[in-house]
From Swiss-Prot:
The keyword Cell membrane is annotated on this UniProt entry: no
NCBIfam families: hisZ_biosyn_reg (TIGR00443), PRK12292.1-1 (NF008935), PRK12421.1 (NF009086)
Family matches, as HAMAP family: HisZ
Taxonomy of the source species: Bacteria, Pseudomonadati, Pseudomonadota, Betaproteobacteria, Rhodocyclales
Entry protein name: ATP phosphoribosyltransferase regulatory subunit
Task of the protein: Required for the first step of histidine biosynthesis. May allow the feedback regulation of ATP phosphoribosyltransferase activity by histidine.
Source organism of the structure: Azoarcus sp. (strain BH72)
CDD domains: HisRS-like_core
Compartments it resides in: Cytoplasm
Length: 384
């Protein structure tokens, strides 16, 4: 059947498309007034550029094809963040802070969940050039503002720090393969598995690793972590970052999950996930990723977030698309001026093509432009 789409690929019909576009404009305008400049990376690039500095999961999610011009392997973007990082590092080449935003379709080889689309409409913001925690504070607050403007306010923003995991894994002396296994166990909060894999790890490192899954809650979690962590400059710096975030964002619904390490291959510091709208899955993900720009010849401090606009729109009431005005195809003097005046006021006006009586309501018309006593007026459309 030629009209059947692949699994997890959907059309956006007029009402949904109108809702998505209105949401896109509103959020991009919010970025603009906060100093974030819009960039539009290409849909496909050479594969090594798209996946450089990213984890294995991004490589597996990327569709691949052969470029008929160069013979090189290309990929359809699965995440726009590496592209924006390339633009900052290699094209803009700014010395100071750079704030960039973006919105576009990405394509995934597999859906992220059973109900997810394989063509998310990714929207995000990135802040480059500032290594301090002030940049992370700005980005988390921007995310909260964006969700509020989208009318899906965050009910919870979970914050973690991959620096804690990296420091503990290094102190435990784990080889990369063992570190991967440890990461998987922490993500699953598999305490029996953690006890088994940490046999032989010296104290207090082992105790700290076993405590991580339970370190979830309010700002008090940071002090609990400090009490059980070994002495380390990296651990001390990570906990200081979390304390500053807790103090600066106390008006937001933030919590701390020190075992949440999603994207730890990619991120280098603070990580966060926002929840809301009754969704069990995160609406937005973000964090610091200072090392990714190295692949493009220029390492820059970087932090940001992204979300799927389609998923966000599902949490909103169905959009009410304003009806259009049906105008005569031809009329007396003044018709063209009347139509243009209505369009200038934001109304949709379409011409009544002959031979389609009885179908104009289906086409979206709910009013008509008619001549009454020498003047063009708008009236309800009846029986069309």
């Amino acid at each position: 059947m030629r009209w059947v789409l692949p699994d997890h690929i959907q059309d956006a019909l007029p009402s949904e498309a109108a809702s998505l576009e209105a949401l896109r404009r509103r959020l991009l305008d919010a970025f603009r007034v906060r100093g974030y400049q819009l960039v539009m990376p290409p849909l496909l690039e050479y594969l090594d550029s798209l996946t450089t500095g990213a984890g294995q999961d991004l490589k597996l999610r990327t569709f691949k094809l052969v470029d008929q011009v160069s013979g090189r392997t290309m990929g359809v973007r699965a995440d726009m963040t590496p592209q924006v990082t390339r633009i900052d590092a290699h094209l803009l080449n700014r010395a100071g802070v750079s704030r960039l935003c973006y919105c576009g379709s990405v394509l995934h080889t597999l859906p992220s969940t059973l109900t997810a689309t394989r063509e998310p409409l990714q929207l995000g913001a990135e802040l480059y050039g500032h290594a301090g925690i002030d940049a992370d504070i700005e980005i988390v607050r921007l995310l909260a503002d964006v969700l509020r403007l989208a009318e899906v306010p965050a009910s919870r923003i979970d914050i973690g720090h991959v620096g804690l995991f990296h420091a503990l894994a290094a102190l435990a002396g784990m080889v990369p393969e063992r570190e991967e296994e440890l990461f998987d166990l922490l993500q699953a909060k598999d305490v029996p598995g953690l006890k088994e894999i940490t046999v032989g790890v010296a104290e207090p490192v082992r105790t700290a690793l076993l405590r991580l899954p339970a370190l979830y809650g309010g700002a008090e979690v940071i002090d609990e972590a400090a009490a059980c962590m070994p002495e380390s400059a990296e651990i001390r710096a990570a906990l200081d970052d979390l304390r500053r975030l807790a103090a600066a964002l106390e008006d937001l619904p933030i919590s701390f999950d020190l075992a949440d390490l999603r994207g730890y291959h990619y991120h280098s510091g603070v990580v966060f996930a926002a929840y809301g709208g009754g969704s069990p899955a995160a609406l937005a993900l973000g964090g610091r990723y200072d090392r990714v720009g190295e692949a493009f010849g220029r390492a820059r401090p970087a932090t940001g977030f992204s979300l799927d606009l389609r998923e966000l729109a599902l949490r909103l009431p169905a959009a009410v698309v304003p009806g259009a005005i049906l105008a005569p195809l031809e009329g007396t003097a003044g018709l063209a001026a009347a139509v243009e005046a209505l369009r200038a006021a934001g109304e949709a006006v379409m011409s009544r093509l002959p031979g389609h009586e009885g179908t104009w309501n289906d086409a979206g018309c709910d009013r008509q432009l008619v001549m009454r006593q020498g003047a063009w007026v708008v009236e309800p459309l009846q029986g069309e």
